[in-house]
Each structure stands twice: as C-alpha cells, then as structure tokens.
Amino acid sequence: MKPTVRRNRAVTMSCVLALLCSVSAAALAAGPEIVAGPAADPTCYVPWASQTKFFKYPAKPGPYRIALANGFIANTWRIQMIKTSKAYAEQPGVKAKLKEFKVVSTGEDVAAQIAAINNFIDSGYDAIIVNAQNPKAFAPVIKRAKAAGVILVAFDNILDTEEAINVDVDQKGLGVLWANWLIKHLPSGGKVLEVRGVAGTSVDTDRHNGIHETLDASGKKWDVVEVVGKWDDPTAQKATADAIAVQKHFDGITAQGGDTGVVQALIDAKHPFVPFGGETENGFRKFCGAHSKDGLVCSSAGTGPAQVAVAMKTAIDALEGHVVPQSVKLPLAIVEDPNFKDGENYYSSQSDNFFVGNAFPTCGINFTAQEIMGQSEANQ
C-alpha cells in the first residue's frame, strides 16, 4: 500500500474515533436514560428501594480516566479506603479498562474538594468517584459534571441528589442497630457515651439520627453524652478519656469509629467494661473477643473501605453502557457477641488499624491484606 493511502486511512480512522467520542460526550451530557431494571449485575447492584430509578448511560469507548476526590484523610478507614482504591485499580481486569486513575484528598475543606472535582471535570476525566465532605454543598458541581458528560459516583458520604449515582450502606440503619444493642443490654436505660464522626458528613448525621430516634422510641430513660472522635483512634481515645474524667461513669457506649482508641481509654481509666455498639476495626474486635467475659459485650458492624471498589466498578459499568441503579445499597458486615472468633472475623496477627470484612463477594470484590497495605494513601 502506498504511504499516501495509509496516511489517508489513518486520518480517516482518527476522524471516525474523534466523531464517536464527540457523539458519546454529547450523549453523556444529556444525562442517562431512565430504564426498567434490573441492573446488569443484579447480585451486586441492589437498588436502595423499590422506587429507585435505573440509569443507562450511552456507552463510551475505553480505556477510561477516572478520579477519586476524597475529603478527610486523617483516620484509619479513609487511609485503608485510599489504599483499597489503588489496589482495585491494579487488578488485571480493572487495570485494562483504565487509562488513568487519579487520587486527591483535600481534608475537611469543602470548597477545596469541590475545586478538585471542578479541576477533574475541566481536565476531561470520564468519571469521578466522590466521598463527599458535605452532601448539600455540591449542587453546582453536580450540574457542571452532567453538562460536561462526566459520570459522578458518590459513596460512603453520598450526594444529596438523584443526578449522580450513590453507593452506600444504610448508615441510619447502622445507628439503629447499635442503639438496639444498647437497649437489649441495658434494660433500665442509663448514661451512654456517643463517640461521633466527622461533623457535617452524611454518615455522621445519619448514624447519629438512627441512634437517637431508636433510643427515644424505646421508652427508657437515656442520658447521652456526645463527643467528637472523627472516626480516628487517637482523637476518639482522648475524647473518651476526657468524657470519663468529667462524667465518671457510663453504662454503655456507641462509637462510629476510632473504637480501638475508645476501649483503650476505658482500660487506661480503669472504667468497667460496658455494652458497646461499634464499627469493624480489627483492634476493636480483638478487645471484644478478649474481654467479653469481663463485660465488653459488643456489636461490631459497618461496611469496609472496599465500598470504594464497588463505586469504581459502578463507574466503569456505567461508562460501558450497562444498566445501574441510581442508588445502590450495600450489605453490612455484622458480628455480635458471643460470635467473635480469632482467624475468622478478627485477626490477632494483624494490625489493630485495619477494618475487617473489607470485601463484597456479591460484586466479585475481595482483597488480601497484603494487596491493600502494599499501597500508599498519598495523592497520585
């Protein structure tokens, strides 16, 4: 074939690809088509409710540029989540579909997180995964993403909109679960320490509301003392120690994270062990397994940081034109006394700073500790 002919064909093919990308971007900007369910992967993508809509975006050619816009980073869960996202991006079946995976954490500054998302939109990313610092502050950037044909998938701290995809567990239901555990083990009510998460986030608000609505509805008398632990062991430990110093005694505890630190504060203060509804940190479960007979009667429930991988999978499937729910409901990982078993649902040989149950088998998502801990939490 003559060089001129080859060049002409190459130019023609480039033009065709450019046209396809242009048409795809324009179609994405129009938003998804609302279609009948089920989802393309119904065992993974469980709709939040019977009235949840199903989205079908126009298929876009890969490989894709996907970004993770995280906010707060200074706790074990967020660090493990960032590492998990990178581990998932390196799995062969996922890596082949990614041209680029970018991670940015902006701290508690909502404006900085929104600016990061705007930058990803301006840079032409195909999808952006978001752990929102404040769910109600994102309306303008959600509209910008839609206009640019960028798919937004929020997880954990989700977005207050039906124009993006949300992936989460029932955070309020988690608060209800913990409160019911205290109601069961404190038949006369009592004084409860509530260790909250990061202020302003939907997770903290939903869990808090679930706890209080359930305790209030029990008909028992409760005195709830609230402190802020930011889902972080050192912060939660200090907040608990300060609360014990002032209040002297608690009949029960519920904590959203940093639970290993909370129990350590009890031990340091020589406070009796009490019923505890908490998260899924390995260190917390170690304590629950070791001190059940001493009164540390635990309900350990939550969702592992691997939900970021479900959000990434959702974004890729949406870009490929597969049907997904607008709101995906993930299962909780629950272990309650007396069912704590070393080597099964906690691991004495592993670090305390590790969230157990970091898998979603129904989505084909699982990780070894080595896969996750071999990654860095730094921006990339």
Predicted regions mapped to residue ranges:
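Coiled-coil-like amphipathic alpha-helices with heptad-repeat character
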Residues: 1-4, 73
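Bacterial N-terminal signal peptides
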Residues: 14-24
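Bacterial N-terminal signal peptides that target proteins for export
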Residues: 3-16
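A residue-level marker of the well-folded mature domains of exported/periplasmic proteins
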Residues: 28-380
